[in-house]
């Protein structure tokens, strides 16, 4: 183990190594990762005990020459997402432990649940960020598309049980400092509050090794994205099957309460749902119209919405939405007023 902590994800059929120290690993079964380690059985037993008790553990190997330490990674609902484990000479102190942050995304409802640890790792301000009931677009980094981000967006659109994902992204924290964050997630079916099975992505994140500020690998895509930006227009990617906002490409839209999607309140005026359903069929390419979206005061605000679709991965499409305030003529055509 080279003296580093191993982060072991424990939500699959077999515990899988997802990090060595701060270095990301792609769900390597622990029996493969430690196949030549004579303490494999002892470490498996330590992981199993931490899973059973939800407690940290310190144990000595049968020959009394090594110590094994474990730290469970427990989600706020009590579910264990993984176990940090370290083994070293008896009497030795382990290295500094990168603190994993457990997190959970309800892919069916479009609601994310973070923890103080996952928010800290993501560079968020704990004094203003609520870990519960977060819209996906609030948890997903806004702005430029990152290398390999299409895979994550495609996974969010497909929401397939059993799917796993791991990656490392460069970003900035709430104070503007460059950070690097690794994460892993696994989709599964769990009972939802409505009695149906929901697709739940459970995962962990942690701060990766520092690196130089990221150089975007797809500069052409970024130039196109920036070139199409317009003042007063706010673009985002969304899941066309349920209108869940996934990622803001521009600054988040300020004139309607897009965060209300994380509650039981309607995502738009009930009378406009049929119009939206027709728009998201994408039969005629880009389509647009005025929809009444949740206002910050609890009412409704008319918003001009243009939707199209974009291929985020081969044969997987997300919706692309552009939001702006409607013109008086567009309000009149829709039979609405600014106060509707």
What is each residue range found by the language model?
Residues 1-35, 87-134, 212-264:
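PAS-family sensory domain signal
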Residues 38-212, 255-335:
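Sensory/regulatory domains in signal-transduction proteins
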């Amino acid at each position: 183990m080279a003296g580093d902590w191993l982060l072991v994800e424990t939500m699959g059929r077999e515990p899988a190594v997802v990090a060595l120290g701060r270095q990301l690993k792609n769900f390597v079964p622990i029996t493969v990762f430690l196949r030549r380690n004579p303490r494999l059985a002892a470490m498996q037993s330590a992981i199993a005990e931490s899973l059973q008790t939800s407690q940290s553990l310190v144990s000595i190997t049968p020959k009394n020459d090594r110590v094994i330490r474990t730290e469970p990674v427990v989600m706020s609902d009590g579910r264990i997402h993984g176990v940090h484990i370290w083994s070293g000479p008896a009497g030795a102190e382990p290295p500094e432990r990168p603190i994993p942050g457990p997190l959970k995304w309800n892919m069916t409802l479009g609601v994310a649940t973070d923890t103080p640890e996952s928010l800290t790792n993501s560079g968020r301000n704990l004094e203003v960020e609520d870990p519960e009931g977060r819209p996906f677009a609030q948890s997903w980094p806004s702005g430029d598309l990152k290398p390999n981000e299409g895979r994550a967006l495609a996974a969010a659109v497909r929401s397939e049980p059993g799917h796993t994902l791991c990656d490392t992204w460069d970003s900035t924290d709430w104070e503007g400092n460059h950070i690097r964050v690794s994460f892993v997630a696994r989709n599964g079916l769990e009972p939802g509050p409505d009695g149906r099975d929901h697709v739940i992505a459970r995962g962990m994140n942690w701060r990766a090794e520092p690196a130089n500020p990221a150089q975007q690998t797809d500069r052409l895509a970024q130039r196109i994205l920036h070139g199409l930006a317009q003042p007063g227009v706010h673009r985002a990617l969304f899941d066309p099957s349920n209108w869940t906002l996934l990622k803001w490409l521009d600054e988040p839209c300020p004139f309607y309460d897009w965060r209300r999607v994380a509650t039981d309140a309607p995502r738009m005026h009930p009378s406009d749902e049929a119009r939206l359903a027709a728009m998201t069929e994408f039969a005629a390419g880009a389509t647009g119209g005025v929809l009444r979206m949740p206002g910050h005061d609890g009412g409704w605000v008319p918003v001009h919405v243009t939707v199209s679709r974009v291929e985020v991965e081969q044969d997987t499409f997300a919706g692309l939405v552009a939001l702006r305030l409607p013109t008086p003529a567009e309000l009149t055509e829709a039979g609405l007023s600014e106060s509707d």
